[in-house]
Amino acid sequence: MNLGARVVIAGTHSGVGKTTVATGLVAALRRAGHRPGTAKVGPDFIDPGYHALASGRPPRNLDPWLCGAAAVPGLAARAADGTDVLVVEGVMGLFDGASDGTVSSTADVARILDAPVILVVDAGAMSASVAALVHGYATWDPEVRVGGVILNRVGSDTHETMLREALVPTGVPVLGALRRDDAMSWRDRHLGLVPVVEHPDVVKAALDRLADAVTAAVDLPAVVALARRPPDLSCPAVSLPSPVGPDLTVAVAGGPAFSFTYTDTLDALRAAGAEIVPFDPLADSALPAGVDGVVIGGGFPEVHVEALGANRPLLDDLARHLRTGLPTWAECGGLLLLSTELDGNAMAGVLPGRGRMTTSLTLGYRHVTTRTPSFLGPVGTTLRGHEFHYSALDPGGTDLDLRSRWGARSEGWATPGLLATYVHHHPGGDPGPVAAFTAACAAHRNHRAT
């Protein structure tokens, strides 16, 4: 596969409005007749939901640490398939990456994809100083090409003129200047923005307003011309699991409480031969009939904990199926759903831990090694993932060893029928875990049929 027109939307730091600008740009490009694809640098689940609403296409992630740098071009090409321009939103500041340097930073992905960068600057509290800021970012790394600037939160026409004049000596063109407008801001909470699935009508209304603003304030033809500047990039195909057999069905949790499942995870499950059957733990009274496995990703069960706890039919049915050995992969919010309780509300009770929300953030990439035999493989099986949560579970399990630069601990449950952990896994660079899970699902189906 080849990757054609592409551009990276980066920020000088977190909070400058990257997601607002990137999402508005995608919506404006689509309105102008383009077919934009999108991707998000890093493991984030929430921002890609905004991209998907704007583009009308499935969201994607690009993470060199989780997936390996070699997999990133292929994942980007998949995100760009059927589009005429790929818009990649960065993470944090342009050069901020994993704890071991700039790995998995926005700059890292821009280098890997040979993609030009548009730098988003919060210009609300500066004038001439913007030139020093942009010059520093544009010259820091010669392999990262800052091809333009979008000024955000500009106060007035006079303010915009001052900013544009200040930037002339840098040689970095101003591609747009967006006015300060609180009506175009997204709602947020403890893990970032509120997911689109929780308030789609509100987001759609704000997105329409944002698309109007970007269309009026950003030079869209110049953005597309910049994206078309690099030559096409040849991309190896992404590794996917081989089919394990026909007629395999896997239930995947969704809805407002469980929206953290990667598009690439769904693709990997389908490649392995699974039909995806969605279910909503808030609304459904039972698992879909006849499924061969269950995936319960993360989300915000803590926000909906009373409603989840009140849905005893679903929780009891889930517990009954798990006790018969139905292969289940539960991550973070899914782990909490299987616990005894969350903030005093009874959950499925499959696991002995009691969950509670805290004020301490657990965040970072993890090397994971199994300490017990499981559907993943024998003791010592490894995978990569990340954590991002404010909750705690006590007891929290001891079947997995998690290592990072800052230390190690044990957590989670890993058995022949269950993986329950705080760690989120992305299959883009390693299809093995999904292949192992679907093999366990097929074995369970065959055993049930005998």
Locations of regions flagged by a protein language model:
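C-terminal and late-domain segments of enzyme folds
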Residues: 110, 244-246, 259-268, 275, ...
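Beta-strand->loop->alpha-helix junctions that form or flank phosphate-binding loops
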Residues: 40-41, 174-182, 275-283
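Phosphate-binding active sites in nucleotide-utilizing proteins
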Residues: 247-323
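Acyltransferase
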Residues: 185, 198-246, 252-260, 417-450
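ATP-dependent carboxylate-amine ligase catalytic core
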Residues: 2-113, 121-148, 157-161
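Structural motif
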Residues: 8, 87-89, 118, 150, ...
